[in-house]
Regions:
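C-terminal beta-strand-loop-alpha-helix "lid" module of Rossmann-like NAD(P)-dependent dehydrogenases
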Residues: 1-284
Length: 284
C-alpha cells in the first residue's frame, strides 16, 4: 500500500501533466483556427482551378499532353504527407497503415516513396518500399519549395514514361473530429466530375487552348499538393487538440480518484493512531 507521501507526489505529478496537456490543447486550437482560415482563403482559387482543368480535360486527348495519358503498369510513386510530431491520436498511424494495406492489396511490393513528415518516414523505413526522398521538419515558409521540387521531378518522369502512376496520400480535413485518410490519384490527370458541378458554366479558352495546357496543368498539380498539405496541417492540429482535451479530462478524473484514495488512506491512518492511543491508555 503506498504511503501518503507517495500519493501526494502522484497527485502533484498528474496535476503538472494536466497543465501541460491543457496548454497543448490551447496552442493546437489557436493553430487550428489559423489553418482553417488559410483553407477558407485558398478554397475559391482551388475550386475555380479544378473547374478550369476539368473543362480542359474534356477537350484534350492524351496526345495533347502526356500528363493525361493513362499508363498500365505498377511503377508507382507515392507522395505521403504526415506530421513531424506525435501526441495526435491515430492521425499518422491510421494513414500509414491504410496506405501499406492498399499497396499490398494492389500487389505493389516496392513503391517509390516521397514522404513529408517524420512519422511517415519512420513507419515506412520498416517496409520494403523505397524511400526516395523525405522532408522532415517541413516548415510552412519552405513548403512551396518542397512542392516544386517533388512535383518537378515526378511530372518529368511520368511524361517520360518512367512512372505509371503517382498518388497523393494525406488526411483530408473534414471537421475537428474527422480527418479522413485519403489516397488521391495525381497522375495521370483524369476528368473531375465534382469540379464540373462546382464550376457550373462551361469555360472558354482564348486565344489558343494549346498555349494554356502546360501552365494550367502545372498549377493544378501544385495546387492539389498544396491543398492536401493545408488539410494535413489542419487535421494534425485538430487531432492533437482532441487528444489533449481527452488527456486533460482523464487527468482530472485521475486526480479526483487519487484525492479520494488519499483522504481514505489519511482517515484510516488517523483512525489507526487513535485506536493505538486508546489501547495504550486502557493498558495503563
Amino acid at each position: 500500500m503506498p504511503s501518503l507521501k507517495e500519493i501526494r507526489n502522484r497527485i502533484t505529478s498528474v496535476k503538472k501533466t494536466q497543465k501541460t496537456t491543457s496548454a497543448m490543447k490551447m496552442v493546437s486550437a489557436a493553430k487550428l483556427n489559423r489553418a482553417e482560415d488559410t483553407i477558407r482563403r485558398a478554397r475559391p482559387y482551388s475550386v475555380k482551378l479544378r473547374a478550369v482543368v476539368s473543362s480542359l480535360s474534356g477537350k484534350l486527348t492524351p496526345d495533347d499532353n502526356p500528363l493525361f495519358r493513362d499508363q498500365a503498369g505498377k511503377r508507382v510513386a507515392v507522395i505521403l504527407m504526415t506530421s513531424d510530431r506525435g501526441l495526435c491520436g491515430g492521425f499518422n498511424a491510421n494513414l500509414c497503415k491504410m496506405l501499406a494495406r492498399t499497396l499490398h492489396e494492389e500487389g505493389i511490393d516496392s513503391a517509390e516513396m516521397h514522404i513529408v513528415g517524420r512519422k511517415g518516414r519512420d513507419f515506412f523505413r520498416r517496409t520494403n518500399h523505397q524511400i526516395v526522398a523525405d522532408y522532415p521538419d517541413a516548415r510552412p515558409e519552405h513548403y512551396l519549395d518542397i512542392v516544386f521540387t517533388v512535383l518537378d521531378g515526378l511530372t518529368k518522369r511520368f511524361a517520360a514514361e518512367e512512372l505509371d502512376k503517382v498518388y497523393l496520400v494525406f488526411n483530408e480535413y473534414k471537421s475537428i473530429l474527422t480527418q479522413e485518410p485519403t489516397i488521391q490519384p495525381l497522375l495521370p490527370i483524369r476528368p473531375l466530375e465534382d469540379a464540373k458541378e462546382e464550376g457550373e458554366q462551361e469555360i472558354l479558352f482564348e486565344p489558343y487552348i494549346e498555349e494554356l495546357i502546360g501552365p494550367l496543368v502545372q498549377q493544378y498539380i501544385q495546387n492539389q499538393m498544396y491543398t492536401a498539405w493545408l488539410g494535413t496541417l489542419a487535421g494534425e492540429h485538430a487531432a492533437r487538440m482532441t487528444a489533449m482535451d481527452s488527456a486533460t479530462k482523464n487527468a482530472g478524473e485521475m486526480i479526483k480518484q487519487l484525492n479520494l484514495y488519499y483522504n481514505r488512506s489519511r482517515q484510516a491512518a488517523i483512525t489507526k493512531e487513535l485506536i493505538e492511543i486508546i489501547s495504550g491508555a486502557e493498558s495503563l
